[in-house]
UniProtKB/Swiss-Prot annotation:
It is an enzyme of class 2 (transferase). It catalyses: hydrogenselenide + ATP + H2O = selenophosphate + AMP + phosphate + 2 H(+). The keyword Metal-binding applies. ATP binds at K20, T48, R49, D50, D68, D91, G139, H140, S141. The keyword Plastid does not apply. This is Selenide, water dikinase. Its EC number is 2.7.9.3. Synthesizes selenophosphate from selenide and ATP. The gene is selD. Keywords: ATP-binding, Kinase, Magnesium, Metal-binding, Nucleotide-binding, Selenium, Transferase. GO terms for biological process: selenocysteine biosynthetic process.
Length: 347
């Protein structure tokens, strides 16, 4: 079979960050009765479901460590590798850091798909690493029933500039650097619903680096930051609220959306991860139309950065966004928690 004829998405049961284990199931897996090992230098661990682990070296610099891998979300091998690598590197930027090195994680059905196709996947990952200015320095591979690719990435950040998902404050405005709808558009393509003018839109967004995160970290008024991936905007926003003990008001019309997403949702192009996300986080949300839920819970692969910004810092944030070619507008606001109200209200 030629590489051109290969459709990688036919060889996996999941796609991109949409194949994440649901938050509810993950909670069960991660529960432990063992005594917790306390390391005072571990600034960010697993407690707040942040994007990466952060370790203070004690010299003003902290190391960021993360890993991310998944099954194909696109058919093209090179694009799959590039997207998976971009998505993994994003976790470093989301913590306010800069990547310094990556190693590859590859699972490949060697008796089903030719090694030359795997090479193209790795080449896509290498290309993304070069875009980030880092080496793909090694890795590990196994014979697996489905294709899997990703990276383990190491980064550094000035300790005082670490950005967490749990440090937002009431009054902060919310901003999102990429449009939503990646899961919807990729599902529409699988269902042969995607119009010609929307071809490759999702791939372009997924291949866009979140390099702006390192610059946003220089702004004191950026109180919290995370990237929006498999748990959808509402899932990751609820983690921001839970971490800081806040509530949020989200303005649906202001949320950036990929072209055509609402039309494709109406045609049933909704990935399975959407319902899993709502099953995990829906009880924290206010009422909303089904179509809104299908977009706000849509699992994103290599999605944008979600920022909580003090009003006084908005001009600085807009200047950094413009430098990176990003158009930003506020999509909501964080508020002091009030009893009897949903954690996230959608207006």
């Amino acid at each position: 079979m030629s590489e051109q004829a290969i459709r990688l998405t036919q060889y996996s049961h999941g796609a991109g960050c949409g194949c994440k284990i649901s938050p509810k199931v993950l909670e069960t897996i991660l529960h432990s009765d063992q005594a917790k090992f306390i390391d005072p230098n571990l600034l960010v661990g697993n407690e707040t479901r942040d994007d990466a682990a952060v370790y203070d070296l004690g010299n003003g610099t902290s190391v960021i460590s993360t890993t991310d891998f998944f099954m194909p979300i696109v058919d093209n091998p090179f694009d799959f590798g590039r997207i998976a690598a971009t998505n993994a590197i994003s976790d470093i930027y989301a913590m306010g850091g800069k990547p310094i090195m990556a190693i590859a994680i590859l699972g490949w059905p060697v008796n089903t798909l030719a090694p030359e196709i795997a090479r193209e996947v790795v080449e896509g990952g290498r290309f993304a690493c070069q875009q980030a200015g880092i080496a793909l320095a090694g890795g590990h591979s196994i014979d697996a029933p489905e294709p899997i690719f990703g990276l383990a990435v190491t980064g550094v950040v000035p300790t005082e500039r670490v950005k967490k998902n749990s440090t937002a404050e009431a009054g902060c405005k919310l901003f999102l650097t990429k449009p939503l709808g990646i899961g919807v558009l990729t599902t529409a393509e699988k269902k042969s619903l995607l119009r010609p003018e929307h071809q490759n839109l999702a791939t372009e967004v997924m291949c866009t680096m979140n390099k702006a995160g390192a610059d946003f970290a220089e702004i004191d008024g950026v109180r919290a930051m995370t990237d929006v991936t498999g748990f959808g905007l509402l899932g990751h926003l609820s983690e921001v609220c839970q971490g800081a003990g806040l509530q949020a008001e989200l303005w649906y019309e202001a949320v950036p959306k990929l072209p055509g997403v609402e039309e494709y949702i109406a045609q049933g192009a909704v990935p399975g991860g959407t319902s899993r996300n709502f099953a995990s986080y829906g009880h924290l949300m206010g009422d909303m139309p089904d179509a809104w839920r299908s977009l706000l819970c849509d699992p994103q692969t290599s999605g944008g950065l979600l920022l909580a910004v003090e009003p006084a810092a908005e001009a600085q944030v807009q200047a950094v966004a413009a430098k990176h070619g990003i158009t930003l507008s506020a999509i909501g606001e964080l508020k002091t928690a009030r009893g009897g109200r949903p954690m996230v209200e959608i207006r």
